[in-house]
């Protein structure tokens, strides 16, 4: 059974509670099924609730008082006077004796009852001291009942409070008291009338009887007595009333039999609070929008919300469900939150009350997408437009300067001012600048040097690359010849790189180098791509030359010599020719026109520079010889490199064939140049201003006395002065080599010839003399001593005459110290620095410079203070430092065992380096060994101590270095440590107790802790300590002793009361009792009559009230800062506390007076039965006095509550006004009012002092004062609270206004964020479009290069490219073509196999050519896979396809460049290695043969050339169409993709992949052979260079030379 179920069974309601709970139970049974689900069977929302539970079950209750700490005795109340009570021990430290708060909410087992218990009345548990039991539910619950089961008698007075939020105030729920009016100022068993305040707490004495003594129940129903309980769904007041997050039970007063007044300890121990069960029945509050509560990630309870709500209690609508206000679900309506209608353009909205009132829909959309606006995002924002109702709104972006209006038309076009253009009127028209309110002004640019455009802001012209000036009217430094036809504007100075200053040369005219073929072929010839000759045909009829191709490989027209050589004067000019083909089946390449020279090579496709495709009609092609990007020569060269190429032009190649078995016809070839002489001026020829040492028009020669600094560079080399050191007057102007004499040598006569020594740089004929060395070996002169020494001694020897061992060697080569010993290397076990000098003794071989911490004759041991293996190969594994700890080592030795490294340790010291003490020892720093810790066996925790101080680790409360004694103010030394004495600082003579824990008390104090006053002593706050009561109280003490004796007799009589058979009647006793009642009644009447006696005090209080009202009216316009008002409030609070202390003193004096009155002697009758009757009379009088005291206490409580309420209202007012501006006048006025209040407060203190004195004289006067003070409360608290609420309301309105402004700001910010995002997108789109435009020509060229490469690489690549185009343009027709092409490829596989076999037979003889063919085949397959990948990607992302295509084009171009680079490297190797010329020629011949043999393998590739013209145009269209694939028929595309996959499967079935793989394998073998060949060439070149360097360093004669290995 759950906790909630047990609680329900345990609750037995009675009285009015039972009918209401019965009704609620019936209703719950009817709707149980409905409450479980938040939607009915049809999916319609309905009210749902979590299950009914005991919310308190196993929830921790916080109790402010619990017995057992320290252990204490309590007695069970029997209710029979005189009977010996059963006493027990409450000890929180023992499980079976503890009664903690956890027992309040555990399982309530009737057979084994557990309960919470407070301390007894002996410990001060009684009114006015209260105990709070606080239950934190964790979240809001709808509370049905609160039930308490008491283990002792129910309290006389207790209250139940609740909080509706965890940080909110405590609200009274219900009061239970036998004195409702006096204790809680509530009417007993009051009720709520219809229309009354249904959130008020009631009070009843129904459960305040002292019986039963155990097991009494108190059940509080939250809806009992509430008129609207049966209309709960429509009562927000009761919905708030049953809501609680916390429940608090405040126990105010115990129920007693009255015998506690005699302070008998055993009696006091029998009075205490004890509760066995604390149950709270209810449901997790979810407002009808959830059927369960769950724990979140923070282990907090919250509702599992439905109906589009959220929040801990489902108290809010989800962010997008604000179409109507949130409501609590009812039985009639689920009140689910409805979504906002934003037309699909927003996911955010808020509830707009005004919109809801006007339209019935309150969802106001925010952050509308697509630049829309309106409550439902139904219209475009201002200055936006859209073409259709379903389209997104686009910003007009009309320029505020260039447009006539910021609003555009329905197409987004703005109205522009004069000279302004663009849809947005944001830029000047071409040729205009300086956009202003009046429009744009025209530019004034020099058309020769500008693009006819100028800066739209400043009017500064946009110059060509090599032009400068505001109007682009002059060339930049280093450039000349400003002309409009030059895309760069000016031509860079060439001058062979020696000068950057040049001008237009005078005397040059235009000259055309041409071939018209009127007589013959004019020296032109034809080559194949591999360089082999091919036939050329000259037609006398057509007067042109032709070439016919019988294979796929292209053939080139080769220009004659007159077009070659120094053609630098053609830089920037045109090369033109007329060309046609016999059929349009053409496939272009990136090398249709090739220029070579000076080690450089450039090429362009035939259609570059705006030329058209070749056709049957003769077309004139014009190519500008310039490096600008407008003329895409590849690779790109710098201006200097391009002119360098033309300065030594070695080859012009024009491609003649573009497909298999086609012919190409060439005519009218013209190269524009210049020459000296009359004619049309050639302004592009330069005349350089040369620096010193240079001559010639172009600075191409060195003047006399100068030479080339780098002869191999020719005219490009700088000119420097000849350097011959005085041994020659002439030098070669090109190489700079001097014609030396006087036994000198070197290019500059900078050294003596072999066998001679001296300084040839002195410039005399006797600079070089013969060497004095035997055998004529080379020698040198020591600069300082001028001594001649030999320079080529044998290895290991040294000295002026090679008579000594060299450094690093030892021996006696001349036998000067004994027998002859040859020089040998030093033997030091690799423990020396090979780069050091003097590692060993040159005579004995003793090692002198051992490293790695080694020593010994051969560095074969570790030196002192180190250990390890000196012969280890790794230096890190050799000798390491001992690093002995000087404090733990015998005599502080630094040495150790040379092998193990163990140091010699002192006693009780351990570790290799003697750095630690043995366990249980310390003080290593003493240097005498470690000392024993000697920790006390009981006082220490583990016997260990601090290794430095020796301090042991002690048990709690124990101290001393060895843990041998208790700490100060502790006792009980033992294994668990020492316990604190805890002596009271005022009552004990010393804070140190005795061995048994008892403290020595001062006079008047008693108790183990000296924390209680002795009998007939009292505690005085103003004078700390227990003071003896006045002498008159001794009589009271004596009387108390007498009464104790009488009380014992009375208890004895009561115990024997039931043993007699007859009842005793005593008329005298009854009369006396009535007289006592009359006296007490008169006393009460007099106390009530004197309430209005002190009119002076009431007048003062009235003035205080008036003053406070005046302050309230002034404070409505005052706004204080928190700091100032906090100081004032603190001072007022101090005054209130002082007044409370005075009232408390008066209360104690009243208590003393009451006790004295209770002890007044009453004359006893002489009758035998009278003693018993008189005792009863005294008891009755005591009860009356107790009741009067209770009334006085109630008056005090009311006064105190009024004071606190006034202080709270005042503080609330101050907090409400915090943060506002405050003027100096208002501060002064407030200070004045405060001084008045302070004076009044001082008067109140004086009045309270007077009350104190009167209370000492008579208790009745104290009652009068308390009653007067109680009348202060209603006036001040209500007025202050009303004013505070008014100002609080104003602050709340201001907060709502601020929230609205913040919301508007957030809306504006989100709107601007959307605009920013749109602007960024437009900028990115503009950049992308600009890049696309900039790269358009490059893409076209790349497309052409791809087409030519596809034709060259094989039929499969072109077929895949055609598949892509067919899939995009003509799906149905292209499917059949794909299938036919695949079958064609299958039929040609045998021809490929035959070609592979023939190529394999000639592999060794034609490595280069076959390697190229294999590479082509590999690339063919790669391109096929690449095309397949691109086709797949096009279906997903058109932009990715374009990027892949561009990257593929770049890879093809790079591949061609790499092949060309390899060819150039081979040519260089052939030039440098003349002895292999014949082999190279043979290789070229074999390559030609291999090419012939490989033609059959490439027949399929040539067939693909038939459709090259249409392919090129289609590819150009493809670039435009790839960005417009939004309307592609995906179904059709998927169908075509299936057909394509089917065709691929058929190709795979033909085993083409395996055959291509075999070809790839063979290609890899050939590539490896080529790489080996290249490596051999590189090594040979290095060897040659090495030999040349050696030759330069050798003297003319050598008498002791080692053999040189030949390359």
UniProtKB/Swiss-Prot annotation:
GO molecular-function term, one example from the UniProt record: extracellular matrix structural constituent
Gene3D superfamilies tied to this protein: Galactose-binding domain-like, Laminin
GO cellular component annotations of the record: basement membrane; collagen-containing extracellular matrix; extracellular region; laminin-10 complex; neuromuscular junction; protein complex involved in cell-matrix adhesion; synaptic cleft
UniProt domain Laminin IV type A: residue ranges: 512-687
Tissue expression profile of the protein: Found in the basement membranes (major component).
Keyword Thylakoid found: no
GO BP annotation list: cell adhesion; cell migration; chromatin organization; extracellular matrix disassembly; gene expression; hair cell differentiation; hair follicle cell proliferation; hair follicle morphogenesis
A Pfam family it matches: Laminin_N
SUPFAM superfamilies hit by this protein: EGF/Laminin
Domain Laminin EGF-like: 284-339, 340-395, 396-442, 443-492, 493-502, 688-721, 722-770, 771-825, 826-881, 882-932, 933-980, 981-1028
This protein's record includes keyword Heme: no
Signal peptide (residue range): 1-33
UniProt-listed InterPro entries: EGF-like_dom, Laminin/Netrin_ECM, Laminin_IV, Laminin_N, LE_dom, LMN_ATRN_NET-like_EGF
SMART domains noted in UniProt: EGF (SM00181), EGF_Lam (SM00180), LamB (SM00281), LamNT (SM00136)
Covalent S-S links between cysteines: 284-293, 286-303, 305-314, 340-349, 342-365, 368-377, 380-393, 396-408, 398-414, 416-425, 428-440, 443-454, 445-461, 463-472, 475-490, 722-731, 724-738, 740-749, 752-768, 771-779, 773-790, 793-802, 805-823, 826-840, 828-847, 850-859, 862-879, 882-896, 884-903, 905-914, 917-930, 933-945, 935-952, 954-963, 966-978, 981-993, 983-999, 1001-1010, 1013-1026
Glycosylation site positions: 58, 132, 574, 648, 1020, 1105, 1159, 1173, 1203, 1221, 1239, 1378, 1393, 1437
PROSITE patterns according to UniProt: EGF_1, EGF_2, EGF_LAM_1, EGF_LAM_2, LAMININ_IVA, LAMININ_NTER
Keywords: Basement membrane, Cell adhesion, Coiled coil, Disulfide bond, Extracellular matrix, Glycoprotein, Laminin EGF-like domain, Phosphoprotein, Repeat, Secreted, Signal
Known function: Binding to cells via a high affinity receptor, laminin is thought to mediate the attachment, migration and organization of cells into tissues during embryonic development by interacting with other extracellular matrix components.
Domain remark from Swiss-Prot or TrEMBL: The alpha-helical domains I and II are thought to interact with other laminin chains to form a coiled coil structure. Domains VI and IV are globular.
The protein's name in its UniProt record: Laminin subunit gamma-1
Organism listed in the record: Mus musculus (Mouse)
Gene encoding the protein: Lamc1
């Amino acid at each position: 059974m759950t906790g909630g179920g047990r609680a329900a069974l345990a609750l037995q309601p009675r009285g009015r509670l039972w009918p209401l709970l019965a009704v609620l139970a019936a209703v719950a049974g009817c709707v149980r099924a409905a409450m479980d689900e938040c939607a009915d069977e049809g999916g319609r929302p309905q009210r749902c609730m979590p299950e009914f539970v005991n919310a308190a079950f196993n929830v921790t209750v916080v109790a402010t008082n619990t017995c057992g700490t320290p252990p204490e005795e309590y007695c069970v109340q029997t209710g029979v006077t005189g009977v010996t009570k059963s006493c027990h021990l409450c000890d929180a430290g023992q499980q079976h004796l503890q009664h903690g708060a956890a027992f309040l909410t555990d399982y309530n087992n009737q057979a084994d009852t557990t309960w919470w218990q407070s301390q007894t009345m002996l410990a001060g548990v009684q009114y006015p001291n209260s105990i709070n039991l606080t239950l934190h539910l964790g979240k809001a619950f709808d509370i049905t009942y609160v039930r308490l089961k008491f283990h002792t008698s129910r309290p006389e007075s207790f209250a139940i409070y609740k909080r509706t939020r965890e940080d909110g105030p405590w609200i009274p729920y219900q009061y239970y008291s036998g004195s409702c009016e006096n204790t809680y100022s509530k009417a007993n068993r009051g009720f709520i009338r219809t229309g009354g305040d249904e959130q008020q707490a009631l009070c009843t004495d129904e459960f305040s009887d002292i019986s039963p003594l155990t097991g009494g129940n108190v059940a509080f129903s939250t809806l009992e007595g509430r008129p609207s309980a049966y209309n709960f769904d429509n009562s927000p007041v009761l919905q708030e009333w049953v809501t609680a997050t916390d429940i608090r039970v405040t126990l105010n007063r115990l129920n007693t039999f009255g015998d506690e007044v005699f302070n008998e300890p055993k009696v006091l121990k029998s009075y205490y609070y004890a509760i066995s069960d604390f149950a709270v029945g209810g449901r997790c509050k979810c407002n009808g929008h959830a059927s369960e509560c769950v724990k979140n990630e923070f282990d907090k309870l919250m509702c599992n919300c439905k109906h589009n709500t959220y929040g801990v209690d489902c108290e809010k609508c989800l962010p997008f469900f604000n179409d109507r206000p949130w409501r609590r679900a009812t039985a009639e309506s689920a009140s689910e939150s409805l979504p906002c209608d934003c037309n699909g353009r927003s996911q955010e909205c808020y509830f707009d009350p005004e919109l809801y009132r006007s339209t019935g829909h309150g969802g106001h959309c925010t952050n509308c997408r697509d630049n829309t606006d309106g409550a439902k995002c139904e219209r475009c924002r201002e200055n936006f437009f859209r073409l259709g109702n379903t389209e997104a709104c686009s910003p007009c972006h009309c320029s505020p300067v260039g447009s006539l209006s910021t609003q555009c038309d329905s197409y987004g076009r703005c109205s522009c001012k004069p000279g302004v253009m663009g849809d947005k009127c944001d830029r000047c028209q071409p040729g205009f600048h300086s956009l202003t309110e009046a429009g744009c002004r025209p530019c004034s640019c020099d058309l020769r040097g500008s693009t006819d455009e100028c800066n739209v802001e400043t009017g500064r012209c946009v110059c060509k690359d090599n032009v400068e000036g505001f109007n682009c009217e002059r060339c930049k430094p280093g450039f000349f010849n400003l002309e409009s036809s030059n895309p760069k504007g000016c031509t860079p100075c060439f001058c062979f790189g020696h000068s950057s200053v040049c001008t237009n040369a005078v005397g040059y005219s235009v000259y055309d180098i041409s071939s018209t073929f009127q007589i013959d072929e004019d020296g032109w010839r034809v080559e194949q791509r591999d360089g082999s000759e091919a036939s050329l045909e000259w037609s006398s009829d057509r007067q042109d030359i032709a070439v016919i191709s019988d294979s796929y490989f292209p053939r080139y027209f080769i220009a004659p010599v007159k077009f070659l050589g120094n053609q630098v004067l053609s830089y920037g000019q045109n090369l033109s020719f007329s060309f046609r083909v016999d059929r349009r089946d053409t496939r272009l390449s990136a090398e249709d026109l090739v220029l070579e020279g000076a080690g450089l090579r450039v090429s362009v496709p035939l259609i570059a520079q705006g030329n058209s495709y070749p056709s049957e009609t003769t077309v004139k092609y014009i190519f500008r010889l310039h490096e600008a990007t407008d003329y895409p020569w590849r690779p790109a060269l710098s201006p200097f490199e391009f002119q360098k190429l033309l300065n030594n032009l070695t080859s012009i190649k024009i491609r003649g064939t573009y497909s298999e078995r086609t012919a190409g016809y060439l005519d009218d070839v013209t190269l524009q140049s210049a020459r000296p002489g009359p004619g049309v001026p050639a302004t592009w020829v330069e005349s350089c201003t040369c620096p010193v040492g240079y001559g010639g028009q172009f600075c191409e020669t060195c003047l006399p006395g100068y030479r080339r600094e780098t002869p191999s560079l020719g005219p490009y080399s700088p000119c420097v002065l000849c350097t011959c050191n005085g041994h020659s007057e002439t030098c070669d102007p090109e190489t700079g080599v001097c014609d030396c004499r006087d036994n000198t040598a070197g290019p500059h006569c900078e050294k003596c010839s072999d066998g001679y020594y001296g300084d040839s740089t002195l410039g005399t004929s006797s600079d070089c003399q013969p060497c004095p060395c035997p055998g004529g070996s080379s020698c040198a002169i020591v600069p300082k001593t001028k001594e001649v020494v030999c320079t080529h001694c044998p290895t290991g020897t040294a000295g002026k005459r090679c008579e000594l061992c060299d450094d690093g060697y030892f021996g006696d080569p001349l036998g000067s110290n004994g027998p002859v010993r040859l020089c040998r290397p030093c033997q030091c076990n690799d423990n020396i620095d090979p780069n050091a000098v003097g590692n060993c003794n040159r005579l004995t071989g003793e090692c002198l410079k051992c490293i790695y911490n080694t020593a010994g004759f051969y560095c074969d041991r570790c030196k002192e203070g180190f250990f390890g293996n000196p012969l280890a190969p790794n230096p890190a594994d050799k000798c390491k430092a001992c690093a002995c700890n000087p404090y733990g080592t015998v005599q502080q030795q630094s040495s150790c065992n040379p092998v193990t490294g163990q140091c010699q340790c002192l006693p009780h010291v351990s570790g290799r380096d003697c750095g630690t003490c043995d366990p249980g020892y310390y003080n290593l720093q003493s240097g005498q060994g470690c000392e024993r810790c000697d920790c006390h066996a009981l006082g220490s925790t583990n016997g260990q101590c601090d290794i430095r101080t020796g301090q042991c680790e002690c048990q709690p409360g124990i101290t001393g270095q060895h843990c041998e004694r208790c700490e100060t103010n502790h006792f009980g030394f033992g294994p668990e440590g020492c316990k604190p004495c805890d002596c009271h600082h005022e009552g004990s003579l010393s804070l140190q107790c005795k061995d048994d824990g008892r403290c020595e008390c001062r006079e008047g104090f008693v108790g183990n802790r000296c924390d209680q006053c002795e009998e007939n002593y009292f505690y005085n706050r103003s004078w700390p300590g227990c003071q003896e009561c006045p002498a008159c109280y001794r009589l009271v003490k004596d009387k108390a002793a007498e009464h104790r004796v009488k009380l014992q007799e009375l208890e004895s009589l009561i115990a024997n009361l039931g043993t007699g058979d007859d009842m005793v009647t005593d008329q005298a006793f009854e009369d006396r009792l009535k007289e006592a009642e009359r006296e007490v009644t008169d006393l009460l009447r007099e106390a009530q009559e004197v309430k209005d006696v002190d009119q002076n005090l009431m007048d003062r209080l009235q003035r205080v009230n008036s003053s406070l009202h005046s302050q309230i009216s002034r404070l409505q316009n005052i706004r204080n800062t928190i700091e100032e008002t906090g100081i004032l409030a603190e001072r007022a609070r101090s005054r209130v506390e002082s007044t409370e202390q005075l009232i408390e003193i008066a209360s104690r004096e009243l208590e003393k007076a009451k006790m004295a009155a209770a002890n007044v002697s009453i004359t006893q009758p002489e009758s035998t039965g009278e003693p018993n009757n008189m005792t009863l009379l005294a008891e009755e009088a005591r009860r009356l006095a107790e009741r009067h005291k209770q009334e006085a206490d109630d008056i005090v409580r009311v006064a105190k509550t009024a004071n606190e309420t006034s202080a709270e209202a005042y503080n609330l007012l101050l907090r409400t006004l915090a943060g506002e501006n405050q003027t100096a006048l208002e501060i002064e006025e407030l200070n004045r009012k405060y001084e008045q209040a302070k004076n009044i407060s001082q008067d109140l203190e004086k009045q309270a002092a007077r009350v104190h004195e009167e209370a000492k004289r008579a208790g009745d006067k104290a009652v009068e004062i308390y009653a007067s003070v109680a009348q202060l409360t209603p006036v001040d608290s209500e007025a202050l609270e009303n004013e505070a609420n008014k100002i609080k309301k104003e602050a709340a309105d201001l907060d709502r206004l601020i929230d609205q402004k913040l919301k508007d700001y957030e809306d504006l910010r989100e709107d601007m964020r959307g605009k920013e995002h749109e602007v960024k997108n437009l900028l990115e789109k503009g950049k992308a479009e600009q890049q696309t435009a900039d790269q358009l020509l490059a893409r076209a060229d790349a497309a052409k290069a791809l087409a030519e490469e596809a034709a060259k690489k094989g039929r499969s690549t072109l077929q895949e490219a055609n598949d892509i185009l067919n899939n995009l343009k003509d799906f149905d027709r292209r499917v059949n073509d794909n299938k036919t092409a695949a079958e064609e490829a299958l039929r040609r596989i045998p021809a490929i196999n035959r070609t592979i076999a023939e190529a394999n037979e000639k592999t060794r003889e034609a490595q280069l050519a076959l390697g190229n063919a294999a590479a082509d085949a590999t690339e063919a397959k790669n391109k096929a896979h690449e095309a397949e990948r691109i086709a797949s990607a096009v279906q997903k992302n058109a932009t990715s396809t374009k990027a892949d295509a561009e990257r593929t084009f770049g890879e093809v171009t790079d591949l061609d460049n790499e092949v060309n680079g390899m060819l150039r490297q081979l040519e260089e190797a052939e030039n440098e290695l003349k002895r292999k010329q014949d082999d190279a020629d043979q290789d070229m011949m074999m390559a030609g043969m291999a090419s012939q043999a490989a033609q059959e393998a490439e027949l399929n590739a040539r067939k693909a050339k038939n459709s090259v013209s249409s392919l090129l145009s289609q590819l150009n269209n493809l670039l435009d169409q790839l960005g417009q694939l939004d309307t592609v028929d995906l179904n059709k595309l998927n169908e075509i993709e299936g057909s394509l996959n089917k065709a691929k499967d058929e190709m795979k079935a033909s085993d083409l992949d395996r055959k291509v793989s075999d070809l790839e394998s063979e290609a890899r073998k050939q590539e490896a052979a080529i790489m080996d060949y290249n490596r051999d060439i590189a090594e040979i070149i290095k060897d040659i260079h090495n030999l040349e360097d050696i030759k330069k360093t050798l003297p003319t004669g050598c008498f002791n030379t080692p053999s040189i290995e030949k390359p």
